[in-house]
Amino acid sequence: MLFRSRTHKVLEGKTLGMIFTKPSTRTRISFETGIYQLGGIGMYFGPNDLQLGKSESVADTAKVLSRYLSGIMIRTFAHSDVEELAKYASIPVINGLTDLLHPCQVLTDLFTILEKKKQLRGLKFAYIGDGNNMAHSILHGCSKVGMNVYISSPSGYTPNEVIVNNANKNAAYMGSKVVITEDPIEAVKDADIVYTDVWASMGQEKEAEERKKKFIRYQVNPELVKNAKADYIFMHCLPAHRGDEVVNEVADSVNSVIFDEAENRLHVQKAIMALVM
């Protein structure tokens, strides 16, 4: 058993290379702090530090980095870059985020829900907003643990069909269900968890104003969450665009666990690094 008052240098002498083609506050700080607390070192590589897939192939970069590092964490746009890096690297590769998936975040979310609700199976999880990488990872993760997953997005912004189909298979096996609906009230009704994310992700800034018009009825506000259970918890992967996808009255309410959720990124990612490195 690990104790908070003790240090656990399980990664002493190990080095994590952190590749960011997409900048992030929480991902960099939580991984860099985490590897340090475990006795290792984190090395940051920004968009201009590596020639990933440009003047050097991803395969060659993976092979070279494998000679220097103990592990790689990559946060990037194309999911194929992570897959190719993992294919050719001889060291562990951790997906810090892609346009398709955000696995470290959903593991954190499941841990946070378990912490707050003391169970996962049978809970109703309502995700309101863009059918983006966060929605995809929620479908993957929550369906595997037997949660009833409701995703509410406007037409044209629903999650990837292949991912939805896989989630339905998981749900059938676990005896739960997955529902995709355009009605946010249906999704939130009697929900144990209400979750949202930004309406325009990084790289979609030019679409932001158009998206606001289409997503306004998907704002998480007091009128919407009154349909959830009284003891629901509100979650957001952050950063939040307050006044858009969520209002202060919800984000700062007693039901909100967003800052516990943010802290848990550190603990969950330490566990991931300790497991694979």
Task: Outline where the language-model segments fall.
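Glycine-rich phosphate/diphosphate-binding loop of Rossmann-like nucleotide-binding domains
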Residues: 21-33, 117-196
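Rossmann-like adenosine-cofactor binding region
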Residues: 169-249
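Phosphate/diphosphate ligand-binding glycine-rich loop within oxidoreductases
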Residues: 5, 11-114, 242
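Phosphate-coordination loops involved in phosphoryl transfer and adenosine-cofactor binding
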Residues: 11-16, 121-123, 231
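Short hydrophobic/aromatic-enriched beta-strand-loop microsegments
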Residues: 92-97, 149, 258-259
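Short, small-residue-biased leader/transition segments that mark boundaries at the very start
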Residues: 1-2
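Adenosine-phosphate binding glycine-rich loop
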Residues: 231-232, 238-277
